[in-house]
Regions:
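Conserved helicase C-terminal RecA-like lobe
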Residues: 160, 299, 344, 358-370, ...
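Acidic, low-complexity intrinsically disordered tails
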Residues: 1-3, 633-724, 730-733, 742, ...
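Helicase P-loop NTPase motor core
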Residues: 30-38, 42, 269-272, 277-371, ...
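Conserved helicase NTPase motor core
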Residues: 2, 7-18, 22-26, 36-37, ...
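Conserved P-loop NTPase-based nucleic-acid remodeling module centered on helicase motor cores
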Residues: 54-141, 146, 150-162, 169, ...
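Conserved two-lobed SF2 helicase motor
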Residues: 83-88, 192-193, 547-554
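Inter-lobe coupling/hinge region of RecA-like P-loop helicase motors
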Residues: 2-10, 14-18, 22-28, 53, ...
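Conserved helicase motor core of SF1/SF2 NTP-dependent helicases
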Residues: 32, 220-309, 426-430, 437-439, ...
Length: 769
């Protein structure tokens, strides 16, 4: 049977599966069967006598970990290999070694909302203006520090950066508050384990001995903390197999370091490198479009992607007049395919760069009766009623959890107001108590009146009754909470229709608890359930078998595949995102993101943009994404939108590249990657790439034929310019060169900042600074 399994693998896949000793780097292109390789390699390790307890497989999503676990079980029934996400693995390690980092083993994992509450309290106590220094910005800075293994003591602000100075003050206070509550945020899970392994050699050696074979999926997405953990666990037994693709590294904004995979061969000179280049997912046309696009990136490891699938249809590129036309046309097309019986709803996926772009699609699909699902697994656990019930459970599990106590002490209402809570907090701070400990002393707090003290004492008594059930099955604990707190009754008595929906959501949470109880038989079921609820991923709620159209961001689409994919709003400022402007590394990541979106498609792919789009409260003309210039013309079908009077038509999309001057050919610009830029003009067919798409004048619908265009090079940083519609403005940023040279202009008229492609632009310099 095993020989048949091996025969089903390609030579490259088999090479990876049979390499069992020493480091291994598997460079796996999209749709190349990497999960199959990982699971077969685990099965092969088991066949060669490696105990299951010595094998650790790490990935990034619960769905991927569950799929890996199920496939290993199929190949090697009865073998319990630990397949886990990084965060869940670190949470388990921390519970086993909590005292080493100053925690109790029943610590609470705070989600983003809970962490923000702690941060806001710290800012208030430190008398820092949250309007000037928002909790979100400070939280992002602290997260960056933790992902880069900078503790509160090690963090140093850069000179002349006010926010950094504030973070240097707040970070230690924030960490102290977390430790006092025996709590961690998501980033702490990694930071604490990395520092624990660094500072405790015996613990590190013990864990290295325990996990003698480590496999890491999606290695290109690891940050410094994850990299450090993996390195620390593979010193004595360097049997580390990592799988990944530098071309699919799309999480730099949350700390992922592309160098981890690019430099793997430097870290492990004796490494075996295996390339999985055959794609089993997409048509030849789709794969050629993706491969051509990603060729413009410089920080990558070249692969020769190929497929034996059919040639397939051309990739469609559609320009719509507005985002409403875009949404309605896509919805109508999907509805027609479903009605004709050619496709099921689950065959379709619509991707976008940011969630805010989904609204018009939702309306359009709903109007046509097309069932759809939004992929956001976090959404359920962020609902008020769910967070309320989970807060009760957190407090039962960890009495020092001040954030959870503040959420539930007056929920449902118990006549415990803000003034009472402030006095409790003051008492707790004075005597270094948790809020629950302070509440137990409410009768001794002189500043509390008798009524308030009695109300607090009643809550403490309620808590004590609930905590008796801490070791019971989770569904049973939840039932006691709903009944004894009066929470269910409070919602049932409400005449608010929204509260009836909340009851339905609570029933769903009870179902989740019941399913957990049926499959988990270890110690501390409540602790494990809360850990699972806290470490939900975006895609966990996505049901692959649910017969609905899927709407999701391209980040969430990672690792998935669909027969038909639509990618909307391929426009400058959205894809690539505006924050990548003038940042080559971020621009390459945006290109990788589009590459990921394209390679999710199996049979059909459409990219689209709208000439006018309402976004963030503004109606504006758009600029086509520069990535559209990088797609291979021969594989594309450009479709114009109606009416024909729109400011920019797709018929003008393709210029005759043969008529361009040599230095204006897009793929010959100086900023094109070396591996894309030909050494001679005959080294590459000139019809391979798109010509420049349009001009700012076209987009604005202005006739500038009577006035000669100003050369793009004439515009300089700081120049004051005149626009026929927006008036006077100042150039605040420049990017690109030649026909791609673009300027961001801040207008004095209140029009805000707008970006223009300068070739034949309506902008005119007033003066040059």
């Amino acid at each position: 049977l095993w020989s048949k399994q091996l025969e089903s693998l390609t030579p490259a896949q088999r090479e990876a599966v049979e390499h069992l000793e020493g480091p291994l780097l598997i460079l796996a292109g999209p749709g190349s069967g990497k999960t199959r390789v990982i699971t077969h390699r685990i099965a092969n390790l088991l066949r060669h006598g490696v105990p299951a307890r010595r094998i650790l497989a790490l990935t990034f999503t619960n769905k991927a970990a569950d799929e890996m676990r199920a496939r290993v079980e199929q190949l090697s029934p009865g073998e319990a290999v630990w397949t886990s996400t990084f965060h869940r693995f670190c949470a388990r390690l921390l519970r086993q070694h909590a005292p080493l980092v100053g925690l109790n083993e029943n610590f609470t994992i705070y989600d983003t909302g809970d962490s923000r509450q702690v941060l806001k309290r710290v800012l208030a106590e430190a008398d820092i203006d949250a309007a000037l220094y928002s909790p979100e910005r400070i939280a992002a800075a602290i997260s960056w520090a933790k992902n880069n293994l900078l503790t509160a003591e090690q963090y140093q602000p850069r000179p002349g950066h006010p926010l950094g100075s504030v973070v240097a003050r707040v970070y230690p206070l924030y960490q102290a508050r977390l430790l006092a509550s025996s709590a961690v945020d998501f980033d702490d899970l990694l930071l604490h384990v990395a520092t624990m392994l660094r500072d405790n050699p015996e613990t590190r050696a013990t864990l290295d001995e325990r996990y003698q074979q480590i496999l890491v999926d999606e290695y290109q997405d690891t940050n410094l903390a994850q990299y450090t953990i993996v390195r620390a666990l593979s010193i004595d037994h360097p049997n580390l197999a990592v799988t990944g693709d530098p071309d699919q590294s799309i999480y730099g904004w949350r700390g992922a370091n592309l160098s981890n995979i690019l430099d793997f061969e430097k870290d492990y000179p004796e490494v075996r490198v295996v390339k999985l280049e055959q794609n089993y997912r997409s048509t030849k046309r789709i794969l050629r479009v993706a491969d051509h696009l990603i060729g413009y990136n410089q920080r990558r490891k070249k692969k020769g992607l190929f497929t034996e699938n059919d040639e397939g249809q051309s990739v469609r590129l559609v320009n719509y007049p507005t985002q409403r036309d875009e949404a309605e046309s896509i919805a109508a097309e999907i509805a027609a395919e479903i009605r004709a019986g050619r496709r099921r709803p689950r065959d379709f996926a619509i991707f976008y760069r940011v969630n805010a772009l989904s609204r018009s699609l939702e309306f359009a699909l709903r109007d046509l009766g097309v069932p759809y699902q939004m992929v956001n697994g976090l959404e359920f656990y962020q609902r008020k009623e769910i967070k309320d019930i989970l807060a009760y459970l957190h407090l039962i599990n960890n009495p020092r959890d001040d954030v959870s106590l503040l959420r539930v002490i007056n929920n449902p209402p118990r006549s415990i107001g803000k003034s009472t809570l402030e006095k409790l907090a003051e008492h707790a701070g004075r005597y270094k108590l948790s809020l629950l400990e302070a509440a137990r002393e409410s009768g001794l707090i002189e500043s509390l009146n008798k009524r308030a003290a009695v109300a607090v004492a009643k809550f403490v008594a309620l808590y004590d009754r609930l905590s008796i059930h801490a070791a019971a099955p989770v569904e049973e604990i939840m039932g006691h909470v709903l009944a004894e707190t009066g929470y269910r009754q409070f919602l049932e008595d409400s005449e608010n229709e929204e509260d009836q929906d909340r009851l339905a959501n609570i029933e769903e949470l009870l179902t989740a608890a019941r399913q957990f109880d049926e499959t988990h038989f270890g110690d501390s079921p409540l602790e494990s359930f809360l850990e699972e609820a806290c470490l939900v991923n975006d895609t966990d709620a996505w049901a692959a078998d649910d017969d609905r159209v899927t709407l999701m961001t391209m980040h969430a689409a990672k690792g998935l595949e669909f027969p038909v994919v639509y990618i909307i709003a391929v426009e400058d400022g959205l894809l690539p995102h505006e924050r990548s402007r003038d940042n080559p590394e971020q621009l390459e990541e945006e290109r990788r993101l589009l590459f990921v979106g394209i390679t999710r498609a199996q049979d059909q792919l459409q990219l689209s943009l709208a000439t006018r789009r309402e976004f963030r409260g503004q109606r504006r003309y758009t600029v086509p994404s520069q990535f559209l210039m990088e797609l291979p013309r021969a594989e594309m079908e450009a479709i114009g939108a109606t009416p024909a009077s729109q400011p920019w038509e797709v018929e003008g999309y393709y210029s005759d590249v043969e008529m361009l001057a040599e230095d204006e050919i897009p793929w010959e610009h100086d900023d094109a990657p070396e591996e894309v830029r030909p050494t001679t003009t005959s080294a590459r067919p000139r019809t391979t790439s798109f010509a420049p798409l349009t001009t700012a004048a076209d987009l604005a619908g202005k006739d500038t034929a009577a006035r000669p265009a100003v050369p793009p090079e004439a515009f300089v940083q700081g120049a004051v310019v005149q626009h026929p519609e927006y008036g006077l403005g100042k150039i605040v940023a420049l990017s690109g060169s030649g026909l791609r040279r673009a300027a961001t202009v801040a207008f004095a008229s209140g029009a805000g900042e707008k970006k223009f492609i300068l070739a034949n632009s309506p902008l005119r310099p007033i003066k040059v600074s």
